[in-house]
Amino acid sequence: MRLGNAYAYCKPSQNVGLKLDLLRGLPGYVGHATSRINRLENQDNYSIKMMRSWPNAYGSALNCSVFDGHGEKGAQLSQLLADKLCSSLDFPEPSWDKQDLKKLVQEYARRFPEGNYWKHKLSTFEKFYNKFIKNCNSKQELLLMKEGDSAILGQNGGRMIFDKMGNIIDKIALLTELDRLRLFYGFARFDLDQCCGLGTAAGSTASSIFLYPYDDPNAPIDEGKDDDSWIISHSGLLKLIVTQVGDSKIILCDQDGIAHALTTTHHINSSRERHRLSIDPSRLDPDAFGETRFLNNFANTRSFGDVAGKPYGISSEPDIFSFLVGNTLHLPRSERSKLPFNGDECFLALVTDGITNKLADQEVVDLITSTVNSWGLKKATPQFVAEETIKFIQAIATKHSDNATCVVVRLSNWGNWPNVDRTGPQRETKLMNAQSNETKLN
């Protein structure tokens, strides 16, 4: 089975506005919904695409992304990203190398000479490249894991995971230097060439997943493997690559129904971001609403566009995380605990801050699982639960609530979580408060 090449996206000005080739090929496996909520315009966008030239034995990867635009031309920029960003990465082998990335940093330094960010990055390029691209091992990529989990890592940061035949599945890291270079260079190049031309009135976040089967890179490629059937019936482990720019979120639901945030938000209150931007926290003052903004203007410290902040460090350099997830049928029981989430995960949810500003991560997961538990697997597909998530946000929204977008990707253990709703009372309280406030206004 081979799915269509088209990606799916939603334009805010349309009710549905979808190219459906891909989604018709994935009934019940990818859900998607978006709404402007109470804003005049929906500046959110999303894309769902099969990448045909991703470097793996199957030759394809499922890419899903959400984009949250801001500024006068925010919708235009998020649409541009949905249309073209990940497509620009879809080729077998990058033709660029380390020196090309250095030249790109030089271009940024020439284009944005006002601040010191790009000059400093250029002067420390070797250190930056070695830390984040060349020698970025699994431990670095899995920085979201708790410190106690570091025991599962082998020497040099590698997970020593073995299959039932005793073969090493993941010896060092899931991503090569070339893989990381593809993402770093590709994002920065696209931002400079495509996004910065929109001027100061546009910016956007970008949160993406790239999902594909784990296979021995030295194994021969069978013709029969060059299809997309693994999305529906793959019985082994999957590589999950996550990239993050901004403050949208990617949440994973494990086999126990527990939420795991796979991304960190790029805000000025993050010590990691303050270090990157060389900012003294004592010089930061919250505004009248209690929010602290970078340069007294920007909610996010990383984004596409936002030209006014580019000289001072607002960049599209992505955080990159890699994980092994999926079906553990071929793993000995003793090896499953070495996986970051113990395998047999249930689903992924990609959501913009119009959702995460209203619901905690566990509430998002529980809203989805409880919807499936209530309606049943036949009715409550990923498409159904994505729409129900947006309906819930609409129900609890206030006058100034932000746009909301939700993409749900079904994984191997869909529907097999415990029948437990850990945050039902919290969601019910939010719903009752919203209804009470609406009654008072009327």
From Swiss-Prot:
Disruption phenotype: Confers rapamycin-sensitivity. InterPro entries: PP2C, PPM-type-like_dom_sf, PPM-type_phosphatase-like_dom. Its EC number is 3.1.3.16, 3.1.3.43. Its cofactor is Mg(2+); Mn(2+). Keywords: Autophagy, Hydrolase, Magnesium, Manganese, Mitochondrion, Protein phosphatase, Transit peptide. GO terms for cellular component: mitochondrial intermembrane space; mitochondrial matrix; mitochondrion. Gene3D superfamilies: PPM-type phosphatase domain (3.60.40.10). Residues 35-411 form the PPM-type phosphatase domain. It holds the Pfam family PP2C. SUPFAM superfamilies: PP2C-like (SSF81606). It catalyses: O-phospho-L-seryl-[pyruvate dehydrogenase E1 alpha subunit] + H2O = L-seryl-[pyruvate dehydrogenase E1 alpha subunit] + phosphate; O-phospho-L-seryl-[protein] + H2O = L-seryl-[protein] + phosphate; O-phospho-L-threonyl-[protein] + H2O = L-threonyl-[protein] + phosphate. GO terms for biological process: autophagy of mitochondrion; macroautophagy; regulation of mitophagy; signal transduction. It is found in: Mitochondrion intermembrane space; Mitochondrion matrix. Protein phosphatase that shows typical type 2C protein phosphatase (PP2C) activity. Catalyzes the dephosphorylation and concomitant reactivation of the E1 alpha subunit (PDA1) of the pyruvate dehydrogenase complex. Required for efficient mitophagy in stationary phase cells. Present with 432 molecules/cell in log phase SD medium. Interacts with PRO2. This is [Pyruvate dehydrogenase [acetyl-transferring]]-phosphatase 2, mitochondrial. It comes from Saccharomyces cerevisiae (strain ATCC 204508 / S288c) (Baker's yeast).
